[in-house]
């Protein structure tokens, strides 16, 4: 299945994301950029998925490029709420530039992994022409899962926001 945000080529990736976030117990997002309005739109669902399992989001380009005050505050606020629910959940920032886009939904043994061009933003989810595809090959799924683990776990690549440090230099 491919999603391009065009009705004659799979439709909006945002609709696919919304459908899956309600069905699965775990979500990992790796995105270069994000939109405050997308964080706000999906905040309740992100918190619910953290209650059911785990919700981890890594943003890959802001350490070097910076963020607006509203972007910074939205990440800090969401991170605090996610960690309060589940310490395994949270917001991560890469210290090396990461521009890829991966969305992994999991429940029990079932995994859906999408890879493509959509950032976690309104333009990525509906208004830009993008190209995202569901990965069905089990070997590729395994490699992508390992890569996500690497992004989230390797301290030379990324760091989790610390809710006790609201002026964390990862967001400046």
What are these model-predicted stretches?
Residues 1-172:
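PLD/PLD-like phosphodiesterase catalytic module centered on the HKD motif
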